[in-house]
Amino acid sequence: SAYFDDDNVLQLEFKLWDVVTQKALTEGGGSADPAGLRRIAHKVADFIYVEFTGDKKYFDTKIVYISESGPQDKRKKRLAIMDQDGHNHRFLTSGRDLVLTPRFSPTAHEIAYLNYFNDEPNICLFEIATGRTEKLGSFPGMTFAPRFHPDGNKLIMSLAEDGSTNIFEMDLLTRNTKQLTRTVHIDTAPSYSCLL
């Protein structure tokens, strides 16, 4: 059932009913203001999806990406975010600097990405709730695709120096960087496994 209370807040209660056994499989509820109707619908859809598939939630998720626009000779690349179904798109950066390779933290509260300012690659951390960007480090040469450790406390990336590209790990609590590979080869695109 769903109804708007005296404060114009939607109150929702639902049951997932098995028509064969004539029993409720699960039930839940919640509330939302009129602007949050899509979000509560996504949360209910997630509840049902998880119950039937056993998979992780999907409908109440976001996508972070690079949006490129403008004339060919003055392209702007902006960090952007939207709901998984394409709604609620918004830009997170102005397009003044080149931005690349955004990645959500495991909590989805932060985004790590590359920012090229004055042709120098910087690894940045964007806090979604506040809109605050923090520069984590500047690295000479090329820097590639920072990715989060499953616990959210480290980043892994590739850094190119003196003709070699090696894998480095940054501790986000101390900002210390540790080199993990030391080869003359090109070691790039590192990623942590989910199961540690």
PLM regions with names:
Residues 1-41:
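Amphipathic beta-strand/beta-sheet edge segments enriched in Tyr/Trp
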Residues 56, 68-78, 94-97, 114-123, ...:
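A flexible loop/linker signature enriched in serine peptidases of the S9 family
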Residues 57-59, 106-107, 150-151, 194-195:
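Residue-level detector of Asp-centered blade-edge/turn motifs that repeat once per structural unit
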Residues 63, 111-112, 152-156, 196:
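Hydrophobic beta-strand positions that form the internal "hydrophobic ladder"
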Residues 83-100, 126-144, 170-188:
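Multi-bladed beta-propeller domains
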